[in-house]
């Protein structure tokens, strides 16, 4: 019974796939997908230039983000504790 219910949707999906594969505009899209890697002749393009300070740029983005995130979380924890919304109990620290 379940198989008979799935027959029509599966046949419809196969038909849509055949129509999409037969459409010439879809093959153009697939060819353009790799146009950044290959020339029209089929030769590989040269490797792009790398930034000499790429690792430095990553550190300049990550380190301030960590400090800003730590500051925000510290401020939120202080706010929650001051307003008695969340107060950690001392009993939890003694469990070993």
From Swiss-Prot:
GO cellular component: uniplex complex
Organism: Drosophila pseudoobscura pseudoobscura
UniProt subcellular location: Mitochondrion inner membrane
InterPro entries for this protein: MCU_reg
UniProt similarity note: Belongs to the SMDT1/EMRE family.
Membrane-spanning residues: 52-72
PANTHER family: ESSENTIAL MCU REGULATOR, MITOCHONDRIAL
Record Pfam families: DDDD
Main location per the UniProt record: mitochondrion
Membrane-related topology note: Single-pass membrane protein
Transit peptide start and end: 1-34
GO biological process, one term: mitochondrial calcium ion homeostasis
Record-given protein name: Essential MCU regulator, mitochondrial
Organismal lineage: Eukaryota, Metazoa, Ecdysozoa, Arthropoda, Hexapoda
Keywords carried by this UniProt record: Calcium, Calcium transport, Ion transport, Membrane, Mitochondrion, Mitochondrion inner membrane, Transit peptide, Transmembrane, Transmembrane helix, Transport
Keyword Mitochondrion: yes
Function of the molecule: Essential regulatory subunit of the mitochondrial calcium uniporter (mcu) channel, a protein that mediates calcium uptake into mitochondria.
Keyword Calcium: yes
């Amino acid at each position: 019974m379940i198989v008979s219910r799935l027959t029509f949707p599966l046949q419809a999906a196969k038909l849509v796939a055949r129509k999409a594969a037969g459409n010439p505009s879809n093959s153009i899209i697939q060819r353009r997908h790799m146009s950044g890697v290959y020339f029209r002749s089929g030769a590989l393009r040269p490797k792009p230039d790398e930034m000499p300070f790429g690792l430095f740029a990553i550190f300049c983005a990550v380190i301030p983000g960590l400090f800003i995130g730590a500051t925000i979380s510290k401020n939120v924890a202080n706010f929650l504790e001051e307003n008695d919304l969340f107060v950690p109990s001392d009993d939890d620290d003694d469990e070993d």
